[in-house]
Amino acid sequence: MYKRSLIAASLSVAALVSAQAMAEINGGGATLPQQLYQEPGVLTAGFAAYIGAGSGNGKAAFLNNDYTKFVAGTTNKNVHWAGSDSKLSKTNETNPYLSAHGSAWGPLIQVPSVATSVALPFNKSGSNAVNFADVNTLCGVFSGRLTDWSQIPGSGRSGAITVAYRSESSGTTELFTRFLNASCSSALEGGTFAITTSFGNSFSGGLPAGAVSAQGSQAVMNTLNAAEGRITYMSPDFAAPTLAGLDDATKVAQVRGVSPAPANVSAAIGAVTPPTTAQRSDPNNWVPVFAATASATDPSVRPYPTTGYPILGFTNLIFSQCYADATQTQQVRDFFTRHYGASVNNDTAITNHRFVPLPASWKLAVRQSFLTSTNNLYIGHSNVCNGIGRPL
């Protein structure tokens, strides 16, 4: 009798542990913020460890509930959220998702998480600061027009330049190619840069000769450090191990005399206003993107700032408004409460990882929209999520 009771109790505990494991909130995607999201305490209770897989894989995992985009061969887990530096395309991603899954899973939420620079670390010995005082020089390096370090004025270096880049669908690549698209002269470069998550497909003239690639932020940094003469574009969290490292222009290039340190993008980010109340029901309006000029039809498109470090953008969060499990619904609210809190929040961790916390006006807009029970955008709103939601 005792043995049967012990077995029954063991089975009950095993079932409970299994249910708890299944109930974890699974997410992953962009590697730019990977180390931030893996910092203890940034993700709140109930969240599984963040999996860095690239923005493209993160979006695909969420949009199709396909966990294999995070871990190949694992088909018994659901995807509950994603991180992406690449904004969801309203036409190609958000609208098809709502058509295919909206009735069963509910609307999606897309909001900026932190602001970021895109740094330009390089591996070329020398004591001079490397400064792309003229953006055309930067464009020439990444188009392949300029092939030797001696062609970068003031660098005090010579030898072949080798561009290292992300091989997979990367949101960091999208942030970088947005800048190149807006800033580079087609007449000078002999081609144009397309805004894309695939650097290999960006420049119409093809990749620079000898360019090398790797998958993920850390792998690209390893590739960069494997041989002299290499340069890449990178998350500030991976480009340098410390905040002071971002200001070391013998290892991380300046652009127009400015380093990619957070202080050099915070003023520009502070000038970006959140969507108006009337605009907030459209996920597209929540994520600002930069371009040569503002758009008359898309309020999320803002002109690049004229001061400070110019290569910047946001890394974003993608969640559902509705989850089938009430516990998960509350856990998602708890994370939003923490991450977008007015006083108790993740700002210290964000700053320590060389990112820029969202301004108070943005955090307030998120709380008003997704954490206020009388707002139709409220996470788990009974009128929207009645009997539907992403699966446990």
Swiss-Prot record:
**Keyword entries, A-Z:** Hydrolase, Periplasm, Secreted, Signal
Question: Which Pfam family name is an example for this entry?
Answer: PBP_like_2
Coiled-coil ranges per the record? none
The molecular function terms of the Gene Ontology recorded here are: alkaline phosphatase activity
Q: Name one GO cellular component term.
A: periplasmic space
According to UniProt, the reaction catalysed is: a phosphate monoester + H2O = an alcohol + phosphate
Q: Which residues cross the membrane?
A: none
**Under which EC number(s) is this enzyme classified?**
3.1.3.1
Enzyme category, top tier: hydrolase
Q: What range does the record give for the signal peptide? A: 1-23
Q: What induces it?
A: Strongly induced by phosphate limitation (150-fold for MDR25 smooth colonies, 1400-fold for MDR25 rough colonies and 5000-fold for MDR1). Highly expressed compared to the same gene in PA14, suppressed by inorganic phosphate, but less sensitive to phosphate than strain PA14.
| Protein localization | Secreted; Periplasm
User: What is this protein's function?
Assistant: Has both a phosphomonoesterase and phosphodiesterase activity.
Other notes = Protein and DNA sequence from strain MDR1 in. DNA sequence from MDR25 in.
- Subunit structure, briefly? Homodimer.
Family of the protein in this entry: Belongs to the PstS family.
Protein name (Swiss-Prot/TrEMBL): Alkaline phosphatase L
